[in-house]
């Protein structure tokens, strides 16, 4: 590990943010800090993760949602002070790292199957 990577790891540890494991295709709710005048509030932004960029401290992800019939995408920096929290609502079952093809789709064809997590049964010795 070189010096720059080490400094980035120390900075991530100093921030103390707990970022859940999520991947493209997952539906997430991002709580964003919004400043209006002199007060600050949290705004929820829920949508499908269509891209994720893992670059240490410079990591980011893009969330797409349909708002009033119009597609809206927003890119967030994972360790930004404006991102208060990230919550995973459901896991998506996709075979791509970047889901940019969802931009051309609408309605049912833009939906993503849910990933079903199997619980392993304990093996009983006979």
Curated annotation (Swiss-Prot):
InterPro entries: Ribosomal_bL19, Ribosomal_bL19_CS, Ribosomal_bL19_sf, Translation_prot_SH3-like_sf. This protein is located at the 30S-50S ribosomal subunit interface and may play a role in the structure and function of the aminoacyl-tRNA binding site. NCBIfam families: rplS_bact. Keywords: Ribonucleoprotein, Ribosomal protein. This is Large ribosomal subunit protein bL19. Gene3D superfamilies: 2.30.30.790. PROSITE patterns: RIBOSOMAL_L19. GO terms for molecular function: structural constituent of ribosome. It comes from Dechloromonas aromatica (strain RCB). Signal peptide: none annotated. Belongs to the bacterial ribosomal protein bL19 family. It holds the Pfam family Ribosomal_L19.
């Amino acid at each position: 590990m070189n010096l720059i990577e080490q400094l980035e790891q120390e900075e991530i540890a100093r921030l103390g943010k707990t970022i859940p494991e999520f991947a493209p295709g997952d539906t997430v709710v991002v709580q964003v800090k919004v400043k209006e005048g002199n007060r600050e509030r949290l705004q929820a932004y829920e949508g499908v993760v269509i891209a994720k960029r893992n670059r240490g401290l410079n990591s980011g992800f893009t969330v797409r949602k349909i708002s009033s019939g119009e597609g809206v995408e927003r890119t967030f920096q994972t360790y930004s002070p404006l991102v208060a929290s990230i919550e995973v609502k459901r896991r998506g079952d996709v075979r791509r790292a970047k889901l940019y093809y969802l931009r051309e789709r609408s309605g049912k064809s833009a939906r993503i199957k849910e990933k079903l997590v199997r619980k392993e049964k304990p093996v009983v010795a006979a």
